[in-house]
A protein has these predicted regions:
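Mid-domain Rossmann-like dinucleotide-binding core that forms the NAD(H)/NADP(H) cofactor-binding site
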Residues: 146-229
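Short amphipathic alpha-helix with an adjacent loop that forms part of the alpha/beta core around
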Residues: 230-235
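Cytochrome P450 core scaffold surrounding the K-helix E-X-X-R motif
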Residues: 55-61
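Nucleotide donor/acceptor-binding cores
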Residues: 15, 41, 176-177
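NAD(P)H dinucleotide-binding glycine-rich loop of Rossmann-like/cofactor-binding domains
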Residues: 104-182
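Glycine-rich beta-strand-centered segment in the early N-terminal region that forms part
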Residues: 33-50, 63-107, 140-148
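Residue-level marker of beta-strand positions
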Residues: 77-79, 97, 133, 178, ...
């Protein structure tokens, strides 16, 4: 088993994390204990920034039904610096700057980390980011240049690839095809940006927030409408 080489200072096995203890309630920020050994395919990352996806809000509110994994850690998009690597890991090394993402990439699929909170197990997925540190599966990490802004890098964990994936992989938009985007948030803006890159036209954005529509035009939206607009189809 690969060690962190931190046994001389047990405090380094403790990190601050946001924990979902009960659905619909505020997250609990508290000390969480990391396991002292990295398992095959796992990577220890020092988290620098984390994004907050709408799906996490839904997860907190249990909009898809009862949460059978409580209590558990959260977050699936972020950036950080690799601290240690487990056995078998070859795609990343100590000191690498990385994006943490929910989609699988190349690399090893590791088991989920086993953390403890108040002496009891706290669950996690293959990647979590609402913590000071995270034990991540190798295939949820992508190395980025060290001079790239880690704050901006979080967008590559979900919003950017999701938006571009919708346009290029799912809808497969072609030159001159029209696009309508409902909701100009992080994903919507990147759908607009990707649509512009493939020369879609028109690119229509619909949102209840006028400021988002204004911002959307910088990303490629050609026509923006408030969702409460009457006779929208005629326009």
């Amino acid at each position: 088993k690969h060690k962190y080489n931190l046994q001389k200072n047990i405090k380094k096995f403790i990190m601050r994390s946001a924990i979902l203890v009960k659905s619909g309630r505020q997250l609990v920020v508290d000390n969480v204990e990391l396991p002292k050994n990295l398992r095959f395919g796992q990577v220890l990352v020092n988290i620098k920034y984390s994004g907050i996806c709408g799906s996490q809000i839904n997860e907190i509110d249990a909009t898809k039904g009862p949460d059978k994994y409580l209590p558990h850690l959260l977050g699936h998009e972020g950036s950080g610096i690799v601290e240690e690597t487990g056995e078998g890991v070859t795609r990343v090394k100590k000191g690498d700057h990385v994006v943490l993402h929910w989609r699988k990439s190349s690399g090893l699929e590791a088991e989920s980390a086993k953390y403890k909170w108040k002496g009891k197990k706290v669950n996690s997925g293959k990647v979590t980011t609402f913590s000071e540190k995270s034990i991540v599966s190798e295939n949820r990490l992508t190395v980025i240049p060290k001079n790239f802004d880690l704050r901006l890098a979080t967008l590559f964990g979900c919003a950017i690839p999701t938006g571009f994936g919708v346009v290029n992989n799912d809808a497969q938009i072609k030159i001159g095809q029209s696009v309508i985007i409902f909701g100009i948030g992080g994903v919507g803006l990147n759908i607009a940006q990707a649509s512009k890159m493939v020369s879609a036209n028109p690119i229509i954005g619909i949102d209840k927030n006028k400021k988002k529509l204004t911002l959307g035009k910088k990303f490629g939206i050609t026509h923006g409408f408030l969702s409460k607009t009457k006779n929208l189809k005629d326009k």
